[in-house]
Swiss-Prot record:
Protein name, UniProt field: Inorganic phosphate transporter PHO87
Native source species: Saccharomyces cerevisiae (strain ATCC 204508 / S288c) (Baker's yeast)
Ribonucleoprotein is among the record's keywords: no
Residue spans of biased composition, Basic and acidic residues class: 95-104
Signal peptide: none
Membrane topology, Extracellular segments: 1-461, 515-537, 605-627, 689-707, 757-767, 824-849, 920-923
Amino acid sequence: MRFSHFLKYNAVPEWQNHYLDYNELKNLIYTLQTDELKQETPTGDLNDDADSQTPGPIADIESNIAAGEPSSSKRRFTHKLKRKLFGSKTPSGSKRGDSDEKAIDGNNINEETIELDELSPQGKTTSFNKNFIRKKFFESRSSSVSSEGKTLFSSYDTFVTNLSDEKLKVDDFYKRMEAKFYERFDHLINDLEKEGIVTRLNETFNPEIQALPPLREIISGTSETHSSNNPFEIHSSNIDSELRNRFDYSEEEMDEDDDVDVFADTTDNTALLNYSQFNIKSQKKSLLKQTIINLYIDLCQLKSFIELNRMGFSKITKKSDKVLHMNTRQELIESEEFFKDTYIFQHETLSSLNSKIAQLIEFYAVLMGQPGNVDSCKQELKSYLHDHIVWERSNTWKDMLGLSSQNNDIITIEDEAEKLMQEKLQIEYFKYPLPKPINLKFTKIENLAVPKLFFGKRAMKIGFIIIVTGVLLGVKTFNDPVEHRCMALVECCAFLWASEAIPLHITGLLVPLLTVLFRVLKDDDGKVMGAAAASTEILGTMWSSTIMILLAGFTLGEALSQYNVAKVLASWLLALAGTKPRNVLLMAMSVVFFLSMWISNVASPVLTYSLLTPLLDPLDYTSPFAKALVMGVALSADIGGMASPISSPQNIISMQYLKPYGIGWGQFFAVALPTGILSMLCSWALMILTFKIGKTKLEKFKPIRTRFTIKQYFIIIVTIATILLWCVESQIESAFGSSGEIAVIPIVLFFGTGLLSTKDFNTFPWSIVVLAMGGIALGKAVSSSGLLVTIARALQKKIQNDGVFAILCIFGILMLVVGTFVSHTVSAIIIIPLVQEVGDKLSDPKAAPILVFGCALLASCGMGLASSGFPNVTAISMTDKKGNRWLTVGAFISRGVPASLLAFVCVITLGYGISSSVLKGST
């Protein structure tokens, strides 16, 4: 990487104007070289001087001249040198010159003025005598040079003067920043003494951390120190060639002094707060800790300021020596004569800064209760520094890369996005050459182009569904033409949902269109509706009370989670579990089961996993307890989907079919809660038996101790009031009309008062809402056409001698299979309307509500695959700190399938028994 870019990427953004202006000095060097070139200088003198310098592009050309080129060699030499200076094209086609290394336009910074007389005696310096430096070093230089005294004096004098100005600028800024940071350091010492954490500064501390690595090693994640005569010498790394290619500026001959070492990638370092930091004592500790971290970052950046500028002076003098044939690097920099009148580059300055940083590490170790583990604390502070630099300079780096890419072939994020957009606009084709080209008036066709998208899996699925739907439309399946077309409609939608040839919610949007096109709606007289009437009817049906309840459930869940009500309550429940792994597992599953009842089983596993972070962080992916915990939460969230009428979309849809039988929230809880709890306990026992969790040692979970605010109490009151109104909805039906109207109350109260914003409303899972709408529309189409009645009568003849229990088992297995392989919600949308019609045709008045209720509960029991429901998808994506997944697909199959069967048994036994005694038949 070129040093000018190296300096840009590693400079503190707020200090940009105060670093060595490398680009300006580099431009000055080439300007001075141009001035020398314009004078009539003998070729031999140039060659003699060049022979004593480091080999480079100019030296190579001059060597050729000395070897005896023709008389025009001088002109060719001048011409080639001008090409280098004035940016003519190189053989690779790139422009030469330094247009790509313009000076950085830094932001104006408001600086605090500090009197230099107030600094420590070590920081006081005398003013720099430029004339003395010029005279001294010019004399030593001119003694070794031939007859070019006048030109050399002018170039040397100008360069050293500008170099001295840069040195004074850097030194002045450093002294002001050091005074500010050291004052903060003294205040920190006083605060630590007041808390009794450390003693005075002159107390001894760990000498092993005195010698700290440069900031560039902290950024790169390595703590190695390089032994070299020059501590600021840059070494090459293993990935030097890779980044050199990435930042290739197509220069014909890259100067070696432009090369610097590069850094290896590091992983991000993060810190998780634990619950012991919520009391007063821990708050003071947190404030002191943050103060130490911030001061550590500032002092390390101050140290990098020294390193980068020292490196810059060395690099720019090396370049001046090569281009202008001087010896400034050895005479000024390596001899350290140039730095004698500065404060920033004194060895005592760097030692004092290293000492302060070392003491901060020691203080941090004492504050964290690890005085004997200084190395670990040092690595932790380095991680904070790394994260700070990545965050602070990310925009700067992106902007610089974007700027560089205007003149070079660097592929930036914007370029990649543009490339992806262009690819997105184009279609890929299979091309087959024609035997003879087809000549048209304006074009000529030589190949037959067929889009590749016609041969993908999605295209094959869609093609198969279209063919089957066409066959069903062409072949008579029912005597009634409307039922015949409705059968094709059901097949088309079911296959689209099952195969996911298009997204599930898009199929939901397609349902009302197909309903109108297939002409399956009938009016009250049994006549087929026209397109206009059918469109109004089906679109009006989609926005129903069910959708309002679904939105209310999302609203309650968002408010409870966003204002930490659910999190605080869950933390107290987990704290009651103690330290036994099986008890902690049971409590975690109980928490997610309880949360699923009120904030849906979509959001509850995410919230529960965040609460379990302190338990999972110390464990890796091989821990049996961690596997059991992650899977147990997922299975419990699946089962929690049956616990309340708003716990899952399938329950909300099912309530629409249960309402005609007078089943409200009270009856729902009476059946669903015992069944769900028993299913959860069976899954808990399965986790204990299949995972060896007894050997894991756990720390006690600490609850979140906080006082609720008025807003939190308001949310709790509104939530409880809404649930109570839903429970007694049948008694107050004359006032509200339906549960959907009650659902408006929390939506208006939370969004109307500003507790939730429009952004929160937009983040609702609208795909689930649209999917539910499609299910309602399909149910309306099937019931209006009379297809369900016909199918129910046909099934009644075959199963009329079977009991309700046997029928529940038959349809229950079907629900389990569809829920496992397709979707819990889709299984409810397709099967429950059919089950209701079958139940209504049976002689037992309780058959229909029992079958509908049982199938509604079984819709949540499909847990055999990693894709079976949102909780399973969340669990399979959970990873440990190293990025390894806790669970595999095999783990889900080996535990999820038995858990599904256990839940199935619970529903057809306990659930069936309670529903038989609690539910009333149709009236």
